[in-house]
A protein has these predicted regions:
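Terminal, basic amphipathic appendages of nucleotide-handling enzymes
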Residues: 2-79
């Protein structure tokens, strides 16, 4: 399992922007991969902006709450 940072897709900008959010994943992701990121409000399209994030950079209180990315963005992959 590795930690990655992603930025969410912003339709109004037609791109990926904003703060980076940390997720765990077992997928062999690379920077630039498009994925589906689960959030409290539902699934969001996102782009991986950093891989192999050290656990020390994530607040230990947040670690048990991290959600897992389990799929690539199929819509983006078909484009």
């Amino acid at each position: 399992m590795m930690l990655v940072n992603v930025r969410y897709f912003k339709p109004q900008l037609n791109g990926y922007a904003g703060n980076a959010f940390t997720y765990k994943t077992a997928l062999p992701l690379k920077v630039g991969d498009r994925v589906i990121a689960p959030t409290r409000g539902g699934d969001n399209r996102a782009m991986v902006v950093e891989i192999n994030v050290p656990e020390g950079r994530v607040d230990e209180r947040v670690m048990p709450l991290l959600r897992e990315i389990t799929q690539y963005d199929a819509e983006e992959a078909q484009a």
